[in-house]
């Protein structure tokens, strides 16, 4: 019976307590008994109670953290934009207060005169000319706000009065009376008159051009402006490339990185190149180049301009070319002549890639075909330095399959390499009619892949000179037959 047992235990405890109080038992035993009773009377925490209290503490901490994060996010989303909106509206009101517009008749009169007059100049320090987006108003500094405030705040083209005819005639007489080709004076005048001036070619559509004959053509790739002059004392042809306009876009951004190469044909060893102008379709070069040539030889020479789009990671794209001949019909030497020429689109078939000279020799008894790569000339420049690192690769082909291939050594930094290297293939007489040779002039690139400058073929399946050269080799066995071959684009 649990109740009788508890009562019995309770009586025993009372008896022991009385004995301890009377001193009938030892003091140490009584102290142990008292401590034991005190421990039994003290409440004990159970394990489930401890786990519940810890869980409550963790949940409380997480709740406080989430509450703090929600307060921070709400402050960022609500308070900060509201404050910025208030500041922006205040500044906008302040900016709109000083705007003063003239009468309607005055505005209409000014708008009608915008396309007839050049613009009013502003200080150099207070403006930044944009060649790519002419419709955006110019940004001024605080020092130039008084002079250019109207041009900044009102998106309308303001022009300056045109110079009088008397001034133009005086300037023309001064230029014609001076036989010297003063480049610095031309550049200084262009800088003074070009600041803040609206360029008409940026605003005109390609179907509407001025009276200078600059009409767009379906195959034209813009126009090139240059100046020609002949120096009789030094016997030099002076060429100044001024600018190009309306070039086609070659990059994904809608712009190009143009530069110009110049040759005085038929000499390709003397080559000049302008600087690369980044991200523009209307580059201004203003560079002068000299070509030593006798005056009597000008009639037989041709001035060749090639406009390229610079590409840092791949082959440069040819935009177009300009060829100038019959100098005496175009220019009144020794006086300077300003010319505008259309940049003509050039297909791959018309690109001059250079020429390769090699000889062919076949020994029927030994069944040995020898091709000797002699030299190349006027190769196309593939590097940014204006040169190439060419080598020649020869492949023995049969029914479209390459049987063997050989290559020459690489000549560094040249467009006119000399090889004099022989390459031998074993070809039996019964197979000589089924094979042909594919010759490729390559540009060695240390970093990327090697690029093909041009190719040519010889054999029964070749065209024109390639077939004739092969037939001549078979007609004269054991005799080297050499010819120059023009390089073509790889198809």
Swiss-Prot record:
Quaternary data: Homodimer; disulfide-linked via the cysteine motif. Can also form heterodimers with SYT3, SYT6, SYT7 and SYT10.
Cofactor note: Binds 3 Ca(2+) ions per subunit. The ions are bound to the C2 domains.
Start and end residues of each stretch annotated as Disordered: 91-147
Gene (UniProt): Syt9
Ligand binding (Ca(2+) 1): 251, 257, 309-311
Comment, domains: The cysteine motif mediates homo- or heterodimer formation via formation of disulfide bonds.
Listed CDD domains: C2B_Synaptotagmin-3-5-6-9-10
Polar residues: bias regions: 91-104, 127-144
Cofactors, names only: Ca(2+)
Upper classification of the organism: Eukaryota, Metazoa, Chordata, Craniata, Vertebrata
Family from the record: Belongs to the synaptotagmin family.
Record-listed Ca(2+) 2 binding positions: 251, 309, 311, 317
PROSITE patterns hit by this protein: C2
SUPFAM superfamilies: C2 domain (Calcium/lipid-binding domain, CaLB) (SSF49562)
Bilayer-spanning residue ranges: 53-73
Keywords: Calcium, Cytoplasmic vesicle, Disulfide bond, Membrane, Metal-binding, Phosphoprotein, Repeat, Synapse, Transmembrane, Transmembrane helix
GO MF annotations in UniProt: calcium ion sensor activity; calcium-dependent phospholipid binding; identical protein binding; metal ion binding; phosphatidylinositol-4,5-bisphosphate binding; phosphatidylserine binding; SNARE binding
Organism whose genome encodes this protein: Rattus norvegicus (Rat)
Protein name: Synaptotagmin-9
Superkingdom as given in the UniProt entry: Eukaryota
Binding site for Ca(2+) 4: 383, 389, 443, 445
